C-alpha cells in the first residue's frame, strides 16, 4: 500500500511537491482554501481583460536553462510561447534623459557608455559580470545533502570560474554599487532596478544573466495559466486537489506530523505533511507554536520587511504594440507618493501588448 502525503497549499510549491510525490509513488492530497491554483502566481479576470499579478520573467524558460528540466517535467510550459523582451527596464527622467537597461549585456554596455563614457569602469564591471554569470550552469539534479563526496567536489570545481564574481556580488548591495557611477542618471536608475537598493547585487546580476542568455522569458498566457499547467500535470498523475478546503491544524503524534484537521472539523490522516503555505502561519497557528526553530525565529523577528508594493491594473481599448519592447517603464511624477513610510518620485508602468491572450 502506498504511503500518503498531505500537502497544504496549491501554489507553485504545493503543486510541484504533489507532482514529484506522485512521480515517486506516493498518494497525494492537496488542500487549498482558495478556488484556484497558483497562490501568489495568479491573474484576475475582469470582463474581457486579464490582469496578471506575478510572472514578469521566468527563470529557466529556455531549454538550456537550469530550471527548464523541472518546468518541463511539471507541464508548466507545455504549449507555451515565450517572449524575451529587448529591455528589462526603461527609466525616463524629467530632463528628457532616458536610460535603457537592455537585456543583452553587449547592447547595454554600448548604450551606457554612450551616455557616460567616464563611467567605463563600473559599466564594464557590471556587464562583464553579467556575461560571466550567464555561462554558469548550477547543478540542479540533486540536493546538496544527496550529492555525496564526489558530487560535491564536482560541484565545487564547476563553480570555481565564477567564484570572484559571486563573492563580490554577495558582499555588495545594489546601492553600494550604484555609488560607483558618477553619472547621476545611471546612479539613480541603477538603485531602482529592483525593489530596494539594500538588496544584494547578486540579485540583479543573476537576473540580467538569465535575461542575457534568453532563459528568463515571459510565458504567454500569464501566471494563472502557468499554474494551471502544473495543476493539470498533478491531476493527470492521479493526485487529488481539494479546493475551498482550508486546513486549521497539523496533527502531530509523538513529534511527527500524521495528518491535518480541516476547518470543518474533518481529520485527514497522512504519513507525511508538506506545508507549502506561509511559514509563520504554519508554525504559529497550524502547529500552535509548539515547533520552534531558531533560524526561522531570527528571520521573523530581525529581518527587514519587504518594501510595500501597490499594483493598479487598467483594461483599456488602446493599441500599445508601438509603445516599446520593455518589461517596465519608470516615469517621474509631479507629486511624490508616500507608501509604507517611504517616498517615491516615480511610477513604474507595464503594458501587456506582447500577450494577445490578456485582452479582447
Question: What is the meaning of each model-derived region?
Answer:
Residues 91, 241-243:
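Conserved active-site beta-strand element of glycosyltransferases/polysaccharide synthases
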Residues 131-237, 244:
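Active-site/ligand-binding neighborhood in enzyme catalytic cores
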Residues 3-135:
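N-terminal glycine-rich phosphate/pyrophosphate-binding loop and immediately adjacent elements
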Residues 218, 248-360:
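Mid-domain catalytic core of redox enzymes
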Residues 29, 246-248:
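Residues located in well-ordered beta-strands
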Residues 84, 243-245:
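Short loop/edge segments at beta-strand edges and connector loops
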Residues 95-96, 198-203, 251-258:
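A short, glycine/Asx- and small/polar-enriched loop/turn
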Amino acid at each position: 500500500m502506498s504511503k500518503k502525503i498531505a500537502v497544504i497549499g496549491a501554489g507553485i510549491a504545493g503543486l510541484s511537491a504533489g507532482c514529484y510525490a506522485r512521480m515517486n509513488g506516493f498518494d497525494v492530497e492537496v488542500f487549498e482554501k482558495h478556488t484556484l491554483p497558483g497562490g501568489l502566481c495568479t491573474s484576475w479576470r475582469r470582463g474581457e481583460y486579464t490582469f496578471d499579478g506575478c510572472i514578469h520573467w521566468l527563470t529557466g524558460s529556455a531549454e538550456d536553462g537550469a530550471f527548464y528540466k523541472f518546468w518541463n517535467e511539471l507541464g508548466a510550459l507545455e504549449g507555451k510561447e515565450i517572449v524575451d523582451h529587448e529591455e528589462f527596464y526603461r527609466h525616463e527622467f524629467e530632463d528628457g534623459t532616458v536610460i535603457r537597461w537592455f537585456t543583452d549585456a553587449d547592447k547595454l554596455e554600448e548604450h551606457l557608455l554612450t551616455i557616460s563614457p567616464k563611467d567605463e569602469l563600473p559599466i564594464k564591471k557590471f556587464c562583464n559580470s553579467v556575461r560571466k554569470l550567464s555561462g554558469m550552469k548550477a547543478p540542479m539534479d540533486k540536493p546538496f545533502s544527496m550529492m555525496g563526496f564526489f558530487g560535491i567536489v564536482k560541484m565545487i570545481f564547476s563553480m570555481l570560474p565564477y567564484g570572484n564574481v559571486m563573492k563580490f556580488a554577495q558582499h555588495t548591495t545594489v546601492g553600494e554599487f550604484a555609488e560607483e557611477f558618477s553619472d547621476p542618471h545611471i546612479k539613480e536608475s541603477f538603485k531602482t532596478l529592483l525593489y530596494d537598493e539594500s538588496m544584494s547585487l547578486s540579485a540583479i546580476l543573476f537576473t540580467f544573466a538569465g535575461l542575457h542568455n534568453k532563459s528568463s522569458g515571459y510565458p504567454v498566457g500569464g501566471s494563472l495559466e502557468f499554474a494551471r499547467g502544473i495543476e493539470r500535470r498533478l491531476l493527470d498523475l492521479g493526485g487529488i486537489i481539494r479546493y475551498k478546503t482550508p486546513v486549521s491544524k497539523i496533527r502531530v503524534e509523538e513529534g511527527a506530523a500524521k495528518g491535518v484537521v480541516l476547518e470543518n472539523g474533518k481529520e485527514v490522516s497522512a504519513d507525511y505533511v508538506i506545508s507549502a503555505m506561509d511559514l509563520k502561519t504554519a508554525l504559529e497557528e497550524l502547529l500552535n507554536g509548539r515547533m520552534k526553530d531558531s533560524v526561522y525565529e531570527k528571520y521573523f523577528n530581525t529581518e527587514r520587511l519587504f518594501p510595500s508594493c501597490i499594483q493598479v491594473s487598467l483594461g483599456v481599448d488602446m493599441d500599445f504594440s508601438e509603445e516599446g519592447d520593455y518589461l517596465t517603464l519608470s516615469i517621474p511624477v509631479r507629486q511624490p507618493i508616500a507608501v509604507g513610510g517611504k517616498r517615491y518620485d516615480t511610477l513604474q508602468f507595464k503594458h501587456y501588448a506582447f500577450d494577445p491572450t490578456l485582452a479582447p
